[in-house]
From Swiss-Prot:
Organism listed in the record: Rattus norvegicus
Active site (catalytic residues): 549
A GO BP entry: negative regulation of apoptotic process
Residue numbers carrying Phosphothreonine: 765, 842
Gene: Ptk2b
RNA-binding in keyword set: no
Keywords: Adaptive immunity, Angiogenesis, ATP-binding, Cell junction, Cell membrane, Cell projection, Cytoplasm, Immunity, Kinase, Membrane, Nucleotide-binding, Nucleus, Phosphoprotein, Transferase, Tyrosine-protein kinase
Protein name: Protein-tyrosine kinase 2-beta
Length: 1009
């Protein structure tokens, strides 16, 4: 998007330390050239990348190398784009960074001439080489459409000039239009309404920066809210434009303010007398402009020019003489300096080569008395493809020049050496074809003579040097990785053809493995795979490495119990935009996070999103995410709040964890270190469940034939549910775990009736430890008595029948006690209900209730929050009690209305709860000074807990609103109800704490008779 800001200097071979990888020596260096004559030029160009290391190229050359060869080497490298057809439009500019002195370098100049003529004028480090588009075709708008790379490069060049020279001078309206056009072009995958989201706009401001699109002066003059609204409105106008349309719209808009296709020089025409004019040179020819109000007058067309000569005058001035066909004398132009005359001469000569029939240079050396420069060795006229082939062959022959600048990242002293000999690797069958070449199965013989099965990645012979660097980038990253769940690098063969040798895993890709074995793979194994990949990602997170392509296609199966993460080709070196352009099959849109699609931002948080999608793939046995959508529709679905549905076999707690990873705000997603802990817990739980199910299936009690008189089964006892773990778990706050039936109390040996606490004393039962929940009293085979005769079987059945009757009697007795306790609670909480009850339960009916007439009433769950009876006190003028009851009523209103209200009205019922909570806390604060100091700590702690409960309720409300139209809507509503219930229970606890303090302070009174 912009060029490199630092000076681009020419450095000697022995002093260069490239920031990223070795230089790309596209220019052929003869073997017999002395080392002192070899140069490395650092040439800057424009790019979309934010990485400064992507915006320049190091070119190795000699003092005899021509400028045209340097330009060609950059164009052939593919660094600025593929398939360049208008190569003659490019030129090389030498700029002095401190004085803005500019010299356009003629293609036939040599590096030695540039050094002797220009670089000696200033310090070497103050010069910079820039690749520029200087010569445009006549109808450049249409011509550039056929060469997309040149079109985008010219756009980047104009954008850079606009931001540096014109942005502060144009009107606010034009600056807003041009900035939004660049926004639309740069973030081409962003939906039209993306900037309407506050989080998206904040991400644009903080992570990308508005300075890249809009002038600072404009941002300072406008208020932030006003500026944001203007951007959103203007962006909507260009939301439907494609990239090329944005570029053309930018050209047309900027052309109304500045001349984008021509250069203007202030000079004098020598025609008997001197006339000061503005000389305009562009695709339409050489024209003069005497005033701003008049139209330019054509002086000459490029087809008419036959010679160009520069002559120095006194006092640093110079004369440019143009020989024009049919004219009696040459056109003489007087300039203020020789450098300006030479720049004009290069511009005119370039247009003559582009538009004229003569492809050589028309510039005549003053020192050679009319000898034209085209008598020098001609510029190679081969097309780019022939030139590409010629240079590739030359570079492969002289491959020893790579050794002159070692890559420090590939050779670290003391580290393992990854170079292997080609004769030690034997290739067998082809496993598949990658982006850069084929992948083979092979055998590697190490230095100990051991034979190791390996996979060998190869690079195509016709691959450009730039693509070879990208191919090698995977090995550069992998050689520094050491983790049991990351693919291991065996070695690298850097000589042509380049090979990367890695461990071979016989089970292949995880996606194919899941499809083949989906009938035999169990849930614990699938969770184990996810846990292992999560550990690998936590390792990458610790070394600040972003993978950017986490999917089952890039995971290999080492054994049925071990998987390994691979394919690090995109981890750091390949630019974001290149990955979008690779091919349809490699587009990762359906795995990407919203900020990666919208803004091309790849961070650890975006890797967390992709990892959750990968978990979804694993639990779906290799299905592609969003297979029912096209790539272009995915971001719209994500923006609406929709997420991937829960796979059929996915545990609910694991799916809840996935949804946390798919939070729209990257900062709210968990880190990989946290995910490892959560997945470890889930894996442990799923494994214990599987073990219990397998044990129950293996050891079943013997079937005993019962007599015909006892065919009717006894009533099924009630089943206490699994107690929730502490809410400090990361998986999902206040998540209602769904425990399989095998772990519930339906098995008689899980929790004996004697051990089951009644609702009255359950409050004093110590909490169950998380792992103790799964410790069942499993029945072993020797626990069963095998009857030896029919009579003995009948006796066993009678004993079992008596035991079952005792259990039922005990449970029915507990139900009577529960019913009495429940009525006492109702009387205390709402006296009106008890007064309106016209049919109280009589003792006679209670006695008759022991006869089983229907299914027993289930006692409260073990995990439920039981509420103790309210103290029997005089509630006259008790504001705390009154406010607690009002708050509970507000919570009940929320519970009853939530399913009927539209999402935008959730805030009304939640606000009602908040107002009542404020009244409650206010009444407690008024009473607090009269209570003992020893009781205040507990009361104040409960008040803080209530405030936290309200904040949690608000968060759940917002979550429910965001997911109102998604498949997560009902789950979010349940979480909202859970949060409101917790708030009501804590309010009751606050009332109990206040009552206890009032009793201690003798402020409580019994109720009046």
């Amino acid at each position: 998007m912009s060029g490199v800001s630092e000076p681009l200097s020419r450095v000697k071979v022995g002093t260069l330390r490239p920031p990223e990888g070795p230089p790309e020596p596209m220019v052929v260096v003869p073997v017999d050239v002395e080392k002192e004559d070899v140069r490395i030029l650092k040439v800057c160009f424009y790019s979309n990348s934010f990485n400064p290391g992507k915006n320049f190229k190091l070119v190795k050359c000699t003092v005899q190398t021509e400028i045209q060869e340097i330009i060609t080497s950059i164009l052939l490298s593919g660094r600025i784009g593929p398939n360049i057809q208008l190569a003659e439009c490019y030129g090389l500019r030498l700029k002095h960074m401190k004085s803005d002195e500019i010299h356009w370098l003629h293609p036939q100049m040599t590096v030695g001439e540039v050094q002797d003529k220009y670089e000696c004028l200033h310090v070497e480090a103050e010069w910079r080489y820039d690749l520029q588009i200087r010569y445009l075709p006549e109808d450049f708008m249409e011509s550039l459409k056929e060469d997309r790379t040149t079109l985008l490069y010219f756009y980047q060049q104009l954008r850079n000039d606009y931001m540096q020279r014109y942005a502060s001078k144009v009107s606010e309206g034009m600056a807003l239009q041009l900035g939004c056009l660049e926004l639309r072009r740069f973030f081409k995958d962003m939906p039209h309404n993306a900037l309407d989201k506050k989080s998206n706009f904040e991400l644009l401001e903080k992570e990308v920066g508005l300075d890249l699109f809009f002038p600072k002066q404009m941002q300072e003059n406008l208020k932030p809210k006003q500026f944001r609204k203007m951007i959103q409105q203007t962006f909507q106008q260009y939301a439907s434009l494609r990239e090329e349309e944005c570029v053309m719209k930018f050209f047309n808009t900027l052309a109304g303010f500045a001349n984008i296709d021509q250069e203007t020089y202030r000079c004098e025409l020598i025609q008997g007398w001197n006339i000061t004019v503005d000389l305009v040179i562009g695709p339409k020819g050489i024209r003069q402009l005497t005033s701003q109000d008049t139209k330019p007058t054509c002086l000459a067309e490029f087809k008419q020019i036959r010679s160009i000569r520069c002559l120095p005058l006194e006092e640093t001035q110079a004369v440019l003489q143009l020989g024009i066909e049919g004219a009696p004398q040459s056109l003489s132009i007087k300039t203020s300096s020789l450098a300006e005359a030479e720049n004009m001469a290069d511009l005119i000569d370039g247009y003559c080569r582009l538009q004229g029939e003569h492809k050589g240079s028309l510039i005549i050396h003053a020192k050679k008395d009319g000898e034209k420069r085209n008598s020098l060795p001609q510029i190679p006229t081969l097309n780019l493809e022939s030139r590409r082939s010629h240079l590739s062959e030359s570079c492969s022959i002289e491959s020893d020049i790579y050794a002159e600048i070692p890559d420090e990242t590939l050779r670290r002293p003391g580290g393992p050496q990854y170079g292997v000999a080609r004769e030690d690797v034997v290739l067998n069958r082809i496993l598949g074809e990658g982006f850069f070449g084929e992948v083979y199965e092979g055998v590697y013989t190490n230095h100990k003579g051991e034979k190791i099965n390996v996979a060998v990645k190869t690079c195509k012979k016709d691959c450009t040097l730039d693509n070879k660097e990208k191919f090698m980038s995977e090995a550069v990253i992998m050689k520094n990785l050491d983790h049991p769940h990351i693919v291991k690098l065996i070695g690298i063969i850097e000589e042509e053809p380049t090979w990367i040798v890695m461990e071979l895993y016989p089970y292949g890709e995880l996606g194919h493995y899941l499809e083949r074995n989906k009938n035999s793979l169990k849930v614990p194994t699938l969770v184990l795979y996810a846990l292992q990949i999560c550990k690998a990602m936590a390792y990458l997170e610790s070394i600040n490495c972003v993978h950017r392509d986490i999917a089952v296609r890039n995971i290999l199966v080492a054994s049925p119990e071990c998987v390994k993460l691979g394919d690090f080709g995109l981890s750091r070196y390949i630019e974001d935009e290149d990955y979008y352009k690779a091919s349809v099959t490699r587009l990762p849109i359906k795995w990407m996070s919203p900020e990666s699609i919208n803004f091309r931002r790849f961070t650890t948080a975006s890797d967390v999103w992709m990892f959750a999608v990968c978990m979804w793939e694993i639990l779906s046995f290799g299905k592609q995410p969003f297979f029912w959508l096209e790539n272009k529709d995915v971001i719209g679905v994500l923006e609406k709040g929709d997420r991937l549905p829960k796979p059929e076999l996915c545990p609910p707690v694991l799916y809840t964890l996935m949804t946390r990873c798919w939070d729209y705000d990257p900062s709210d997603r968990p880190r990989f270190t946290e995910l490892v802990c959560s997945l470890s817990d889930i894996y442990q739980m799923e494994r214990d469940i599987a073990i219990e199910q397998e044990r129950n299936a293996r050891y079943r009690p013997p079937k005993i034939l019962e007599p015909t008189a006892f065919q009717e089964p006894p009533p099924k006892p009630s089943r206490p549910k699994y107690k929730h773990p502490p809410q400090t778990n990361l998986l999902a706050p206040k998540l209602q775990f769904q425990v399989p039936e095998g772990l519930c109390a339906s098995s008689p040996t899980l929790t004996s009736p004697m051990e089951y606490p009644s609702p009255v004393n359950s409050l004093h039962t110590p909490p169950l430890h998380r792992h103790n929940v799964f410790k069942r009293h499993s029945m072993r085979e020797e626990d069963f008595i095998r009857p030896s005769s029919r009579e003995e079987a009948q006796q066993l059945w009678e004993a079992e029948k008596i035991k079952m009757r005792q259990v039922l009697d005990r449970q029915q007795k507990q139900m009577v006690e529960d019913s009495q306790w429940l009525r006492r609670e109702e009387r205390c909480l709402d006296p009106m209900v008890y007064m309106n009850d016209k049919s109280p339960l009589t003792p006679e009916k209670e006695a008759g209730y022991t006869e089983f007439t229907g299914p027993p009433q289930k006692p409260p769950r073990l995990g439920a929050q039981s509420i103790q009876p309210t103290a029997n006190l005089d509630r006259t003028d008790d504001l705390v009690y009154h406010n607690v009851m009002t708050l509970v009523e507000a919570v009940l209103e929320l519970k009853n209305k939530l399913s009927q209200l539209p999402p935008e009205e959730y805030v009304v019922v939640v606000k009602n709860v908040g107002l009542n909570l404020r009244k409650l806390i206010g009444s407690v604060d008024d009473l607090l000074p009269s209570l003992p100091a020893s009781s205040r700590t507990e009361i104040e702690g409960t008040q803080k807990l209530l405030n936290k409960d309200l904040a949690e309720l608000i968060n759940k409300m917002r979550l429910a609103q965001q997911n109102a139209v998604t498949s997560l809507s009902e789950d979010c509503k349940r979480q909202m109800l859970t949060a409101s219930h917790t708030l009501a229970v804590d309010a009751k606890n606050l009332l109990d704490a206040v009552d206890q303090a009032k009793v201690v302070a003798n402020l409580a009174h019994p109720p009046a008779e």
